[in-house]
A protein has these predicted regions:
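Asp-based, Mg2+/Mn2+-dependent phosphohydrolase catalytic module
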Residues: 2-55, 64-88, 95-281
Length: 281
């Protein structure tokens, strides 16, 4: 079955998006651009279209483990040419939040280079004795020992920050627990509620729009998650595209009170629709 601009396949949602009229695109990465180390179909064509049409674009990812340079290099290994200024991560959003809220604060951080470097660059010091904050991101450094350490520091008064509220993330052969799942034991043990800085936090979305130099009505949010990507775009006043190349299915959508503007199989469909071509339903 073919989907065209007159198809009823999207009739239950807000309607078609004129992608040619949009100035900016904010895109998730995991499940949208790649799975693990495998680039998804249509991505190269989508990025080339963004360049050819002089669109402003930003990869806004809740993955706190990588720096923008590492993300650029990761895409380069997949044959995709995207420079560092096109990335904004939940690690950078977390560091910006702490820099603005508590300049010169100290933290006990659980995470990878992306989070640690962002914190250092924001003038935040590491402290495993009496930190102002415990900051949790994704990463291989998460263990029972670090969990116990973080729990006790929060129990003694440190405030709890999560880089993002993703419960899981897609990998090539399934899913992996993400930041929200890693923060949950600390919350449960201490009775403390964490503050999450990544999507769908509006602070991160506003920063993304500023980086694009776009008004929300001129931009599109593209992601594979209803609970972070679609809701963050919707609440920011953007058009939203849910792609089915990641963790969501059409059945997933039915469990939410809100809807994306469009549902597509992948980002390659954006190019096809912009060119007036047919896409697979």
């Amino acid at each position: 079955k073919q989907l065209t601009t007159n198809s009823t396949a999207t009739a239950n949602f807000d309607g078609m998006i004129d992608f040619n009229e949009k100035k900016g695109f904010i895109c998730d990465m995991d499940g949208v651009i790649y799975h693990g180390n495998r680039v998804l179909p249509g991505v190269a064509e989508f990025i080339q279209w963004l360049h050819d049409e002089n669109k402003e674009y930003l990869f806004l990812t809740n993955n706190s483990g990588y720096t923008p340079r590492e993300l650029s290099q990761k895409l380069a290994r997949m044959g995709l040419d995207v420079t560092e200024e096109h990335f904004y991560t939940s690690a950078l959003a977390t560091a910006a939040f702490l820099r603005d809220q508590a300049p010169g604060c100290s933290v006990f951080a659980i995470g990878e280079a992306g989070l640690l470097n962002a914190l250092y660059d924001a003038g935040i010091t590491m402290n495993d004795v009496n930190p102002d904050y415990v900051v949790v991101g994704e990463g291989r450094s998460y263990s029972l020992d670090t969990l116990t350490k973080a729990t006790n520091l929060v129990w003694k008064g440190a405030k709890l920050i999560g880089a993002n509220s993703d419960v899981s993330g897609p990998i090539e052969n399934g899913i992996v627990p993400a930041c929200r799942a890693l923060v949950a034991p600390i919350e449960m043990a201490t009775g403390t509620q964490a503050y999450f800085c990544g999507k769908p936090n509006p602070l991160m979305m506003r920063t993304g729009l500023r980086m694009l130099h776009c008004h929300s009505a001129e931009a599109v949010m593209v992601g594979d998650r209803m609970d972070t990507d679609v809701i963050s775009g919707m609440e920011s006043g953007m058009s939203t595209v849910l792609v089915l190349s990641g963790v969501s299915t059409r059945e997933t959508i039915k469990t939410y009170a809100y809807r994306p503007s469009m549902v597509l199989n992948g980002v390659g469909d954006i190019v096809s629709l912009a060119r007036g071509e047919k896409t697979e339903d």
